[in-house]
Amino acid sequence: MKKGYRNAIFVVVYSKKENKIEYLVLKRKHHWTGWEFPKGGININEKKEHAVKREVMEETGLKVLGVKKFNYSGKYRYKKKFVDRKGLIGQSFSLYAAKVKKGKVKVSKREHSRYKWLEFEKAVKKVRFNNQKKSLRIVNKWLSER
């Protein structure tokens, strides 16, 4: 069987009210434990912007008000094999930001256990992996310049 990378999106979810920006982070419980932002695979023939809106709704219950694509992508290898990822050795991703209205989050119980709205400095310390930290920095820089 040919092994490959799952085509996916990273979505930095944010809420902006006046000059206050907060980022949504989720506590992962499926495959590994730690904090992250919404992410997920892109379905066959699905446009990436649609995948962004779908993943945010599935993982948080929040409606996306706006989407921004960034010129940042990458890939990483899984540290172990997953039953639900047969034939895949890792994930390739493209970065997006999704603006939402801050509200009560309905986390996907299968994947996450909790959520937090955090300002940038706390959010960047909270997320686990360097590619997620870099993603937050990119989005925060863009938002700070607007």
List where the protein language model places each region.
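Active-site segment of metal-dependent pyrophosphate-handling enzymes
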Residues: G61-K104
